[in-house]
Amino acid sequence: IDSLELTARSHNRAMITEVMGRDAGHLALHSALAGKADVCLIPEIPYTIDGIIAKLKEIKARGRNHAVIVVSEGIKTEDGQVVSSAKNMVGEAVYGGVGQYLCNEISKRYGDFQFRVTTLGHLQRSGVPVAFDRLLASLFGAKAIELLDQGEDNKMVIWKDGEVSAVKLPDVV
């Protein structure tokens, strides 16, 4: 998202970035927060094209000529419909393509930005972990094996106060 913001700024555009997640918006939300996106659309909160345009107008009124919109593939309209142009063999919505759909719909009604769409798709799963990620994974794995060796189950390994520990699953939920 950071790189797309730089591209949006340097070319005076609005970048629409479609991310995976199906019916859960946490990937889009966390990507948007980490990348400082201007708009984030998730399945849990229905959207309107008018609402998106209103936000883009606010951005423009503040003197900015660029914006970043992060959209989860499973977003829903106000009436609860998944935005999808395709259906599978049993009539369920096939996810993907919502970024281009939004680009087309917004462009028809608001011309103050040029829009470009990027679909991250499986690239989201292929980032290179930093050293801390690798260390944390190793520590979590070691703790999980330790718990199993001790005959403990129904626990989740966590990082708390700078240490690896475990909590009972019912306490997590």
Range-by-range predicted roles:
Residues 1-114:
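Accessory alpha-helical/coil subdomains and C-terminal extensions
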Residues 94-173:
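C-terminal non-catalytic interaction/assembly regions of soluble proteins
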